[in-house]
Structure formats: C-alpha cells, structure tokens
Amino acid sequence: MHKFCRIAVAVALSIASISVLAQEKEVDKDLPVLAPESQHATSTKRITAQFTRAHYKKIKIDDSLSEQIFDRYIKQLDYARNVFLASDVESFAQYRDDFDTVIARGKLDIAYQIYNLNLQRRLERYEYAISLLENEQPFNFELDESYDFDREDAQRPTSVAELNELWRKKVKYDALNLTLAGKEWGKIQEVLGKRYRYAIKRLKQSESEDVFQIVMNSFARVVEPHTSYLSPRNAERFQMEMNLSLEGIGAVLRAEEDYTVIQSVVSGGPADKSKELKPKDRIVGVSQDDKDFVDVIG
C-alpha cells in the first residue's frame, strides 16, 4: 500500500449518523475490563478439537504452535506497531509457550490480560491525538518529514516519547490529507476530533466476545492462512455486510485498523464499471451524487 492512498469513491453506500453528544457521553465512560465468559472455555476446547480432528492439515498442539498463535495474536492487536511499547511485548513473551494451553484447555485469562492492556494503550494514543488538535495553529507542512504508513515489520517504540512522535506524524498525515482536500484548520480539527472520539467510543464498546474471536482467529490463521473463525454474532453481521457490499457498490470490503479496505471488486458491478476502485484501496469518505463527502475513517 502506498504512503499516500487515493480517496476511494464509494457510490450508493448509506451512512448512519451518530450525534456528537452521544459520542462525548461515550468517551466519558471507563474502558471495560474484559474477562472470558462461562461458555468460552467449552467453545475453545470444541473448536480446537474440531481443528485437530477434522481439518485437512494434521495439527500438533505444542510449543511451536503456541508461539505462532502468540505472534499472530500480538500482530492482530497491534498490526502497525504503534500501540504497544517494546517493553509491553517483552513482558508478554513469558506467555509465548502457553498459548497451546489457552486453546487446548480453554484457559483464556492470559489472552484477555493482553487485550485489556491493548485497550488502555489505544485509549492513551487517541487521547494524545486529540490533544494535538487543540493547537490554534495548523501543522507546518513545509518541514522535510516523512510518515511511514506500512509499519508491519518496523521496530517497536521503546518509550512513550517515541510513541508520541509516531502518532504526531500520523495525526499530521491525517491533517495533510484533509488539507489537500481543501479543508481549513478549523474543519480539520472538527473532522479528526470526531474521528478519534469515535475510535475511543468503539474501544469502550468492546465485549468479551471480541477478544474470544481474535484468539480463535489467531489459531485458525496459523492452522491455515485462509481459515477464519467468526463468532455466531459476527458471522451473521459479516454475512449481512458482505451482501450489502456485493449488492451496493460491487466490492468485497474488510476492516484494517481504522480503515475500510477494498478486498476485491466484483466483475461487472458498479465499482468495476466506475474504474475508480481497485483492491487494497482504502475508503476514507463516501458520498451520493453531488453531495459532500462524509468521513468514514474509524
């Protein structure tokens, strides 16, 4: 993915409006402290048994598998390596050989502890991002700086100061995109503030089932890259969203961090005919007809 992605035009998508007041009330709430639910231990053991007995690949539950699941889990929680500190991940390393126990016996406490810290770290990052928008003067785009958009293989930050610098550049990058779209600083503050507050709102709406799905999906992807686990609730939602995607703009969408990404374009559909969208494009705004674009990041 290039550092500067194009604004993808998504036609005929309906946008649900969220009031600013509701967002502010949600931001004031505390982060949830998530823990496994009673059914998760049984579900984990059944899913593991199904994979080990019925999957076409022979799976051995051992430390090697455990380490792969652990690495995948951390990657899913912090894909861009801009949330966890290096010391956080180092402290998790003591559990790297325990994830076979997590999936085989349904002992999920370790995974939930890591997830709860991830929620806290993300909250800190978005609060810092919002604080950068309080400046009366916009960012100086004349400085010779670069923002590394793809940090999948980057070194993890070793201090809060390094994290802050990463996020300063991220916010500046977001502001630059809006500046190039013709927005003034006041409007940029409004748009990005709303985006980051909505991200905080989503953090505070996290549920135990969200953690469970990520753990099980980490296991499934290690078994086979094209294998996924979806909880019943999310499977239903996924099917609905897939149907809407295919019937609406003619594209298959997926979530990646704060973005909706085009996974594939359906031949002959509206997106294909428009020649405006292609796989890996990020949708940052949508509109209908000649109306203004609505920001959909976050």
Where are these regions (language model features)?
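Short beta-strand segments of a lipoyl-like beta-sandwich/carrier module
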Residues: 259-264, 271
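Envelope-exposed proteins and targeting segments
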Residues: 52, 65, 245-251, 258-261, ...
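Bacterial N-terminal signal peptides that target proteins for export
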Residues: 1-8
